[in-house]
Amino acid sequence: MKLRIAAHLCGWPQEIVSDRRRVMEIVKGAGYEGVEGFGAESPEELVELAALAAEYGLHLVNVGSRDTLMKARLNVTLGNNAAEVHNARKKDGRDPTDAELDELAGPLEPQIATFSKYGVRPFHHIHLGCLLETTEDCQRVLKRLPGLWLLFDTGHLLAANSNPLDVLRRWPKQIAHVHLKNFWTQDPKVRWDAHKPDFWKTSRFCDLAEGNTGLDVKAVLDGLVKAEYDGWVSIEEDHPRRDVADVWRDNRDFLRRIGY
């Protein structure tokens, strides 16, 4: 089984992202099949964007829109079987009470219904500060919202002191999208706390080959193949420290070296 690999534009300089053709050139030149990070607010805008991507043999992944119905329709038109619901955020970064969980889950339910109507899997980002942040959050939220799918983000799970492989082993058939990235911290032998104000002074997301917190990238990808995962794997690196063309090329080359 072949995994489909996309480049995510999170962290790319605005002057590059605003030049869509330049984005396509970089992504295609680095060897990716798709690109994630674009949005559209009308069918006409989507047509222009999709036509440009097609010139480079690229697929548009998880296209965003402010409107839930528009997002569902745009993605199903592209043949995407999954798209992202709007993130629900924890209050003050703490785990919600049962009542607060119900309050946060409420706005997600109509989004789940809208996406499901069109055969689009509604996924929520596993992300620091959001409703889904840790392995324990996944267990609790999926029980409360059984129609929700996971955006499996390896970097955010690591930053939250959760093991991405635990999530993959427990919910292999509930993953609808993947953000693959690594995590680096100044002293990996000491337990880090992403909720401390100075956390990002000593920790960061990093190149796939650069992490020092135990992520086995090949094991993650092998696990997705074993689970017969049919979605996209987007390579993401928030706040890259080098030129994005070099970073995304190096990350793609790293995947090739481990068989992907």
Predicted feature descriptions by range:
Residues 1-78, 147-149, 252-260:
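N-terminal pre-domain/capping segments
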Residues 3-9, 35-37, 58-64, 83-85, ...:
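Hydrophobic faces of well-ordered beta-strands that scaffold small-molecule active sites
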Residues 12-18, 34-48, 64-71, 92-95, ...:
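Acidic-and-aromatic substrate-binding clefts and catalytic sites of carbohydrate-active enzymes
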Residues 20-24, 43-50, 68-73, 105-112, ...:
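Generic structural signal for well-ordered alpha-helices
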Residues 30, 110-121, 145, 219-230, ...:
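A structural motif corresponding to the C-terminal end of an alpha-helix
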Residues 59, 67-152, 159, 245:
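Active-site acidic/histidine proton-transfer and metal-coordination neighborhood
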Residues 115-210:
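Acidic/histidine-rich catalytic cores of soluble enzymes
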Residues 231-258:
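C-terminal/domain-terminus segments
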